Regions:
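Cysteine-nucleophile protease catalytic domains, especially the papain-like/related folds used
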Residues: 1-79, 302, 323-326
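Generic ordered-secondary-structure signal
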Residues: 5-15, 104, 122, 183, ...
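General structural signal for secondary-structure boundaries
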Residues: 19-29, 49-52, 87-93, 165, ...
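Active-site-adjacent substructure of cysteine-protease-like catalytic cores
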Residues: 58, 63-154, 166-167, 374-376
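Noncatalytic regulatory segments and standalone regulatory/sensor domains
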Residues: 128-376
């Protein structure tokens, strides 16, 4: 078996043993599933293309999504390439969102700086954290808006100077010190930086870089990570004054710095966690009664201090089974401390703005269930 086949086999071992919707796959079944898509002989195996990797996952009942770091085009004389994800979120950030969600991601590598070099395949199943979160901002309001190509700008006048309101966002991924990697020729559970992908101690060991990755998703997860990120950040921007009001209630003053964390999870696990970690009866009743789709994207936010204490100040819940259309159509609830909005399946978009005050804790538990488990 080649590296791609080994990694697909172990990913399907995970899905088949954990979820009743999937089953494990034999090497012979993997061979049969790509027979119709191959124009060359399959034995002896030369490995799988990215499209064939995705096809195997499709045959196993998953709905994979492929991300390429670079794309090629013909300029009429030569084939040229360009980086696809130059704006927020970038290629590595998208990868992190899926890893943060506890999804095993199939990563395709190429020898660094050599287009004709060796290819390789690994699986990423988690990440390690630094002791203290750094302040590498995603950007101030004007920066992350321009990176997202958003044309709308919210300005205030200060004497003769026009300035942006400042809301500094820090991605939780800047606190990542490395990723947990499974590689078929070395010891498992290695923690590697994405900038240092070597799998041998030899002096002439090949150094790899990521060329693409395949995310095996549940078939009804229609919202991609980059869309969930854009909606969440845009909503934070539109809700700037409400967010600041919540920060002020918690005794925080400018400059406002928020750590955001984005992940995909099941509504069942999310509701169970929120109910079990609730402090007040009102909180338990609220989370037990809200209607949620099977899968949701959650964007948590808090300060660097609350983040390190595994607490948050607010969260945005998005419908992961919806496609990206209008910003508010996928928003289910927004909680900012003890202020919360909720829009049911049949409610209009205007309900996203309908805030209600509930006797709930202003700081509440960071979600740590059914995605990545902490190993101390």
């Amino acid at each position: 078996m080649t590296c791609a086949e080994v990694n697909i086999w172990q990913i399907m071992e995970y899905f088949g043993n954990r979820y009743k919707n999937y089953r494990t796959i034999l090497p012979s079944e993997m061979f049969e599933s790509v027979m119709d898509t191959s124009d060359v002989r399959l034995l002896p195996s030369d490995g799988l293309t990215v499209e064939q990797e995705s096809h195997v996952f499709m045959k196993c009942g998953l709905a994979p999504k492929i991300y390429y770091k670079r794309s090629e085009y013909d300029d009429g004389e030569f084939m040229k390439s360009y980086e696809q994800y130059r704006r927020a979120p970038n290629f590595e950030e998208i990868l992190h969102f899926y890893v943060e969600s506890g999804i095993p991601v199939l990563i395709n590598l190429r020898e660094k700086g050599n287009k004709e070099g060796d290819n390789h395949c690994i699986t990423c199943i988690g990440h390690a954290l630094k002791e203290n979160i750094g302040k590498n901002y995603i950007g101030e309001r004007d920066d992350f808006l321009s990176r997202m190509q958003t044309t709308k700008k919210y300005l205030i006048d200060n004497d003769d100077k026009t300035e942006y309101n400042r809301l500094n966002l820090i991605g939780s991924w800047v606190n990542c010190s490395g990723y947990v990697i499974l590689e078929d020729h070395s010891s498992p559970y290695q923690i590697k930086s994405l900038d240092d992908l070597k799998f041998s101690e030899k002096e002439n060991a090949i150094e790899y870089e990521i060329e693409s990755f395949v995310v095996p998703l549940y078939k009804h997860v229609f919202m991609a990570a980059e869309d969930a990120y854009e909606i969440a950040v845009d909503l934070l921007d539109r809700s700037y004054y409400g967010v600041v009001e919540g920060l002020n209630r918690n005794g925080l003053n400018p400059p406002y710095e928020l750590v955001i964390r984005l992940f995909l999870t099941t509504s069942k696990s999310y509701k169970n966690f929120r109910i079990n970690s609730a402090v007040t009866e009102n909180e338990k009743v609220f989370y037990s009664q809200i209607a949620l789709p099977k899968f949701i994207w959650v964007c948590e936010y808090g300060t660097s201090k609350t983040y390190m204490n595994h607490k948050i100040l607010g969260e945005i819940v998005l419908d992961a089974t919806s496609a990206k259309h209008h910003i508010f159509e996928s928003v289910i609830s927004v909680r900012n401390g003890d202020s919360v909005t909720y829009r049911g399946p049949a409610d209009p978009n205007s309900y996203v703005h309908l805030r209600r005050k509930l006797p709930m804790e202003k700081e509440f538990a960071m979600y740590e269930e059914n995605n990545l488990k902490r190993i101390c």
